[in-house]
Amino acid sequence: MRRRILLASLILAALSHPAKAVGDPAAGEKVFQRCRACHQIGESARNAVGPKLNGLFGRPAGSIEGYTYSSANKSSGIVWDEPTFRDYIKGPQAKIPNTKMVFPGLKSDQEIDDIVAFLKQFDSDGKKK
């Protein structure tokens, strides 16, 4: 009887704590192909239609030197962390109305997991960590 209770308790504990999302950087690189029309990443990245995305996580929105951001983006007060980026990439205009970003967003949680894993590989100099 004790074993059944212990087993049931372990199962309930496991179910009450969802697994942390894990993305595949290689799959994220494929998802990033949709972003390449406007953004670059890596050691030779430059600002283009959109800002370069090196070292995205941990930096304030609207802070890449040499890129002209919308006033909405600059005044958003956002510091890019994983939860904020996940919310943003689902619908950029919903998260920051009047942002220059016209991309409609990613709808697949797996694609979002993957692109996060891909972007997190790059430091602010575009080097893979």
What are these regions (language model features)?
Residues 63-83:
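Short Fe-S-cluster ligation motifs
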Residues 15-32, 43-44:
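Electrostatic cytochrome c docking/interface patches
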Residues 47-52:
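Short cysteine/histidine-rich zinc-coordinating motifs and their immediately flanking basic loops
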Residues 33-41, 115, 119:
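The canonical Cys-X-X-Cys-His
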Residues 8-14:
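Bacterial N-terminal signal peptides
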Residues 81-129:
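C-terminal capping alpha-helices of c-type cytochrome domains
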Residues 37-45, 58-59:
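Detector for the c-type heme attachment site
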Residues 1-6:
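Bacterial N-terminal signal peptides that target proteins for export
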